[in-house]
């Protein structure tokens, strides 16, 4: 069965480098790592495909980014999952997480949306929260800054210096989850 790896984010250049789009940044990192080009799919998504592993043990992987806004992600991703006959047990969603320090990554299956509109849309569209989540820590804003404004801002200069390593680790987590499973991935990468 095909794995569907989804990076949550918002479309457009004005959002591309924001904290809220860190999931899509990891998708782009995976695309570079596997030397694939993205194309537009009829489900209103941008996708790229590759094989992870070798021979009979290779996994088919579709990288996906919705072309709509974060809170509308579920519909296009569900259409894509139906197209590839992928059920939620083979879907990995990468998203920004305020409640985890910048650079830390945690992986789980299922759970609540913690107020994240992209996860709300996914769960509503699929009728289940039982997909995998790779929670990419962006930390909380300092002082009185509104979290909704914070996630739509670019990373700070010190964070930008660490971002390439963070995105590379995010890509490693995706590959580990597909090849090694949840428990091995959690024990190796959850921080």
Where in this protein do the model-derived segments appear?
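Nucleotide and nucleotide-moiety/phosphate-recognizing core
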Residues: 1-110, 119-134, 141-146, 153, ...
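Short glycine/threonine-rich catalytic loop with a Thr-x-Gly-x-Asp
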Residues: 112-114
